[in-house]
Each structure stands twice: as structure tokens, then as C-alpha cells.
């Protein structure tokens, strides 16, 4: 059994890095900094939900576009990233990261609340390729949340499975 090394209630950085942010219509590109911090005690092991009161705070700073900067609190890192992406989509901006690719989804989420990887949804039932949320992605592969969710539902129905399989 994997045990968490952090039982502290001090904020703990889970991930963060500089990424590329792209405007859908104009094609403008700019750097953005994404950071995710856990506030509260983490789960006792990887397959357990964090204790009540644990929040994940994702901060986005888009260089040269302060109007896009946001800070989001959510129950999981994926929820925080999803809410951040929704905010950007309203302004026609997208993050060029693996977590925004149409063909990627965090299928381990129901069992691993702190998961920070996405799987490529290929023609196999069990994904073979995993990437960190913030891994660089080809701008041609990124899409809206709706496109990504639609692709995931097609993948689920192809294998007659439920989310979390």
C-alpha cells in the first residue's frame, strides 16, 4: 500500500510550470504560469479521498493579459483545472497542455482524487500512454471542454465501460 508522506495541513504544491496560452481566433500566443496547491491534509494513500475540508487551489497568471488571471478552489486538481479552462474558453483562450487535448482524459480520477495525469484515449480499452496535466501539447490537438468530454463519452461507449474503469 502506498502511503502519503504528507499529513501536514500546510499548503503543499502539487504541480506548476510555465505553459503556452493560445487565442482561438487570432492565434496569439503568450506564456502563462499554472500552479496547483493542496490546502489541507492529503489522502492517507493514493486510492483514498482526501479528508473533508481539503481544497485544491489552482492559480493561472497569463503574461500580458491580467484580465485572464484567475484563482480557483475545487475538490480535486482536475476540477480546479476544468474551472480554469472554462474561464479561459469564455475569452477564447486555451492552454496548450495535455489536459486540454481532445483525446486525453484523467480516467483514474474516481479512484485517485489527486491524480495529475491524463490518458490518451486510443483504440484500446486500457490506455497505454499517460502524460502530466501540464505536458506540452500541439495546439492542433487541444479543444474545448465540451469536445473533450464528448470524445471521452465515445471512448466509454466503445468499450461498454463506466467512468473509472
What is the role of each PLM region?
Residues 60-66:
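OB-fold (S1/OB) nucleic-acid-binding surfaces
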Residues 2-57, 69-72, 78, 82-86, ...:
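Long, contiguous binding/interaction regions
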Amino acid at each position: 500500500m502506498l502511503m502519503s508522506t504528507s499529513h501536514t495541513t500546510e499548503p503543499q504544491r502539487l504541480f506548476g510550470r510555465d505553459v503556452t496560452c493560445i487565442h482561438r481566433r487570432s492565434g496569439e500566443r503568450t506564456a502563462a504560469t499554472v500552479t496547483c496547491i493542496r490546502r489541507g491534509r492529503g489522502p492517507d494513500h493514493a486510492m483514498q479521498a482526501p479528508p473533508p475540508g481539503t481544497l485544491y487551489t489552482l492559480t493561472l497568471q497569463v503574461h500580458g493579459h491580467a484580465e485572464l488571471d484567475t484563482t480557483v478552489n475545487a475538490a480535486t486538481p482536475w476540477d480546479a483545472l476544468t474551472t480554469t479552462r472554462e474561464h479561459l474558453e469564455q475569452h477564447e483562450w486555451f492552454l496548450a497542455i495535455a489536459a486540454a487535448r481532445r483525446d486525453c482524459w484523467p480516467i483514474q480520477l474516481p479512484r485517485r482524487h489527486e491524480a495529475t495525469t491524463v490518458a490518451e484515449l486510443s483504440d484500446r480499452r486500457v490506455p497505454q500512454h499517460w502524460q502530466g496535466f501540464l505536458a506540452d501539447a500541439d495546439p492542433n490537438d487541444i479543444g474545448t471542454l465540451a469536445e473533450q468530454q464528448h470524445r471521452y463519452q465515445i471512448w466509454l461507449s466503445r468499450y461498454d465501460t463506466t467512468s473509472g474503469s
